[in-house]
């Protein structure tokens, strides 16, 4: 009687990886490395910082990457991957078209503009829309509801607005609010710690949208002046890097909002620019400037995206949320 060949059992949790005992697993989970995906994009130095020996850290990361088949891909494979990215509708066809179909997963999308330009409105709308079925522009599949995390740094979140937007879409407002995890970040360290914790929450709760509104306010307030610029940019860079990891590893959309400041040296054209310096110029995959227009209309302009042309679109902020203008 012949023997039946069996496939080698592949690790499905951090505790099953080679070199990971109970105490090491506890350290990894406490530090936000509770999944194989999170370990695969970690660096040995990051694991050493939480008390894991360098050789063990290298072994763990190597094993995690093998499990996820992290390797070189052909350009054609990359094309197919990008074509399969999911997108969340903004509620406005004009704006969706500008963004190439909506707010895409595996990407940080930055909306920046002056007060009242619609940044937080878009964040609220996306937090509702992500819960829609795929065929309606959301990321929910069957009984698996896509959820959102809303990190609020300026106190701009309004549950009343979520309720209003949900009702207009024919959704149960209480269910919609149950699927949005809200947290108020009180300072930059707290903000960074929240994002670290998301490496555990995102896969566990099927979070498909992470909102940070706004990403720069605490960093600017706590590190003013040129003498603190290097420290501020270093911390902000690490924060954005972690958000990018979350987007990539868990196929999640990330929206960050940002403020603008006036440039006194600009005499022609738009004298405003997003705050955050070069760190924020390069971290987001899509950067969109928002401007006020007449009445409830707003103008969105793509200023940087490798796959999108520089272009503008007009959308409206209505009682029901983000929509196309009526005229």
Swiss-Prot record:
| Record has Amino-acid biosynthesis as a keyword | no
Q: Which Pfam families match?
A: HHH_5 (PF14520), Rad51 (PF08423)
Q: Name one GO biological process term.
A: DNA recombination
Listed binding positions for ATP are: 113-120
An example Gene Ontology molecular-function term: ATP hydrolysis activity
Give the record's keywords alphabetically.
ATP-binding, DNA damage, DNA recombination, DNA-binding, Nucleotide-binding
| UniProt xrefs under SMART domains | AAA
What HAMAP family does this protein's entry cite? RadA_arch (MF_00348)
* Role description: Involved in DNA repair and in homologous recombination. Binds and assemble on single-stranded DNA to form a nucleoprotein filament. Hydrolyzes ATP in a ssDNA-dependent manner and promotes DNA strand exchange between homologous DNA molecules.
Spell out the family assignment given in the record's similarity comment.
Belongs to the eukaryotic RecA-like protein family.
This chain's protein is named DNA repair and recombination protein RadA
- Species of the source: Ignicoccus hospitalis (strain KIN4/I / DSM 18386 / JCM 14125)
Question: What's the encoding gene here?
Answer: radA
């Amino acid at each position: 009687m012949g023997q039946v060949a069996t496939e080698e059992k592949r690790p499905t949790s951090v505790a099953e990886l080679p070199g990971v005992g109970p105490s090491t697993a506890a350290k990894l989970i406490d530090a936000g490395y509770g999944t194989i995906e999170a370990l695969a994009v970690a660096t040995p130095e990051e694991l050493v910082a939480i008390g894991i020996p360098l050789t063990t850290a290298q072994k763990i990361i190597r094993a995690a990457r093998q499990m996820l088949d992290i390797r070189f891909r052909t350009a054609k494979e990359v094309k197919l991957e990008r074509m399969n990215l999911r997108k969340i509708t903004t509620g406005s066809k004009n704006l969706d078209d500008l963004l190439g179909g909506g707010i895409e997963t595996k990407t940080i999308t930055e909306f920046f503009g002056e007060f009242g330009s619609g940044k937080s409105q878009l964040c609220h709308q996306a937090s509702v829309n992500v819960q829609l079925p795929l065929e309606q522009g959301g990321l929910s599949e069957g009984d698996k509801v896509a959820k959102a995390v809303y990190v609020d740094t300026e106190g701009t979140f309004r549950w009343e607005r979520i309720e209003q937007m949900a009702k207009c879409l024919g959704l149960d407002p209480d269910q919609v609010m149950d699927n949005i995890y809200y947290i108020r970040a009180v300072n930059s360290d707290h903000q960074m710690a929240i994002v670290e914790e998301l490496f555990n929450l995102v896969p566990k709760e099927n979070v498909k949208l992470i909102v940070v509104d706004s990403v720069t306010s605490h960093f600017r307030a706590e590190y003013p002046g040129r003498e603190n610029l290097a420290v501020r940019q270093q911390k902000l860079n690490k924060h954005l890097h972690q958000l990018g990891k979350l987007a990539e590893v868990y196929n999640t959309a990330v929206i960050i909002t940002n403020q603008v400041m006036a440039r006194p040296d600009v005499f022609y054209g738009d004298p405003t620019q997003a705050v955050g310096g070069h760190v924020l110029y390069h971290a987001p995959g899509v950067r969109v400037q928002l401007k006020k227009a007449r009445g409830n209309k707003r103008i969105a302009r793509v200023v940087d995206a490798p796959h999108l042309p520089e272009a503008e679109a007009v959308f409206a902020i209505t009682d029901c949320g983000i929509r196309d203008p009526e005229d």
